[in-house]
Amino acid sequence: MSITKDQILEAFAAMSVMEVVELIEAMEEKFGVSAAAAVVAGGAADAGAAAEEKTEFDVVLTSHGDNKVGVIKAIRGATGLGLKEAKAMAEAAPVAVKEAVSKEEAEALKKELEEAGAQVEIK
């Protein structure tokens, strides 16, 4: 005696929700499977959206170049640091000159430091 798919569907339709839950649990035990829904990987799309929405940038001095004195002056003007601190920052490259600034401020600082002879990245 063979049961068709239609007969199985009719039997499901006639069951209460609790009976269906019990049937699913029994099937999981019998066949060693889980009826849990698979998790869809959406992390890559979220990371792309986060990159587009970035509003804070870090200005990183990668090298003071040949004009160390000019770069130190530019750092002092941009950060308000003293001579000793600005010199230490220029010599510690790569180092973040300013962190969590707007894109416009980051671009302006990058331009100022590059004009002084430094190599700069915005992250």
UniProtKB/Swiss-Prot annotation:
InterPro entries tied to this protein: Ribosomal_bL12, Ribosomal_bL12_C, Ribosomal_bL12_C/ClpS-like, Ribosomal_bL12_oligo, Ribosomal_bL12_oligo_N_sf
GO process annotations (BP): translation
CDD domains noted in UniProt: Ribosomal_L7_L12
GO cellular component, one term: cytosolic large ribosomal subunit
GO MF entry, a single one: mRNA binding
Keywords, in A-Z order: Ribonucleoprotein, Ribosomal protein
Known function: Forms part of the ribosomal stalk which helps the ribosome interact with GTP-bound translation factors. Is thus essential for accurate translation.
Subunit structure, as described in the record: Homodimer. Part of the ribosomal stalk of the 50S ribosomal subunit. Forms a multimeric L10(L12)X complex, where L10 forms an elongated spine to which 2 to 4 L12 dimers bind in a sequential fashion. Binds GTP-bound translation factors.
Family: Belongs to the bacterial ribosomal protein bL12 family.
PANTHER family for the chain: 39S RIBOSOMAL PROTEIN L12, LARGE RIBOSOMAL SUBUNIT PROTEIN BL12M
Name of this protein: Large ribosomal subunit protein bL12
Gene coding for it: rplL
